[in-house]
Amino acid sequence: MAWVHGRVQGVGFRYTTQHEATRLGLTGYARNLDDGSVEVLACGEAEQVEKLIAWLKAGGPRSAHVEKVLTEPHSPTEDYQDFRIRY
């Protein structure tokens, strides 16, 4: 689980995160939170999850401005079949 803070809403952040996660073979979701951050849940091989986290920390899409990424290990209670954008 990751929370991405900065200018990450209204800039295509969830869409490009979905694309990158799918490219890495991950499942889960990305959703906007009321505080202006984006929550990302990524499930899959640990190495691929780490690659997504590194991508998030590197700033994600060019249109975004990531200030910080907070992460926390998470054991999902759902079995995600793909990576989706949640609303």
From Swiss-Prot:
Matches recorded under SUPFAM superfamilies: Acylphosphatase/BLUF domain-like
What are the recorded GO MF terms, alphabetically? Answer: acylphosphatase activity
For this UniProt record, give its keywords in alphabetical order, as a comma-separated list: Hydrolase
Q: What is its EC number?
A: 3.6.1.7
Q: Which parts of the sequence belong to the Acylphosphatase-like domain?
A: 1-87
Residues at the catalytic site: 14, 32
HAMAP family from the UniProt entry: Acylphosphatase_entero
Spell out the protein name for this chain.
Answer: Acylphosphatase
The record lists the lineage as:
Bacteria, Pseudomonadati, Pseudomonadota, Gammaproteobacteria, Enterobacterales
